[in-house]
Amino acid sequence: SGRMLDVLVGPAGAGKTTAMNALLRAWEAEHGPGSVVGLAPSAVAAQVLADDLGIATENTAKWWQNHLLYGTTFEAGQLVIIDEASLAGTLSLDRITHLAQDAGAKVLLVGDHAQLQSVDAGGAFAMIANDRDDTPELVDVHRFTHPWEKTASLELRHGRTQAIDSYLAHQRITGGAAETMPDAAYNAWRTDRDKGLISVLIAETHEDVTELNRRARADLIHDKTLNPDREVELRDGTAAGVGDTIITRNNDRRLRTASGRDWVRNGGVWTI
């Protein structure tokens, strides 16, 4: 485009990663290996980007800290991909794009402004995408097996209430009293697990999450799936031992895996 800042918009499952891989190959063919770097608002998202594209990545806050402390910056001819850009604060994006411009690099913001927004003051990604007449947007969703799911996901993205009717018609939503739904959700999760399916149990409050985790762990101990002989107490008062799955809630680069290549990230999922 000739611009130093471009955007790529796409709903979940539309092929943004595939598009970025194609762009990576084309850019490196012209500018050389290692000329594409990646950033993302969270450490987990940055790691996903690194795994998907095979490039060096960092989260935006850490990169900015490295810039302030060590003078880290960009190089002329580099392509800086900022993934999940709708989650990045406007000030963060402004700082990074100005540094890229000064260095002669190009920035590509990738994401979906119809999904979650930044915790910080945000909206820059949506503003740029909506302000331009030639913003590229991926519109075909490839992630789902059933055609109705593709349509419903896009309706949900655009805030169209008929999406709810689709999910109800296909028995994807179950309603009930607040007192009974935790039991219903837990039993559905347990049924899936007993069938060998991958199932995720999500609750609205920390209290509900803690209680459901206690219940699930007690059942797994009863089934002898878990051994409670050696365990440690977690922050919410629950316990964990060998075989348990936990989620870490802070970034701590001092806590590394045995290989030394991976470290504890906020939102990281681990098996003890």
Predicted regions and their residues:
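Conserved helicase motor core of P-loop NTPases
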Residues: 1-3, 23, 102, 110-271
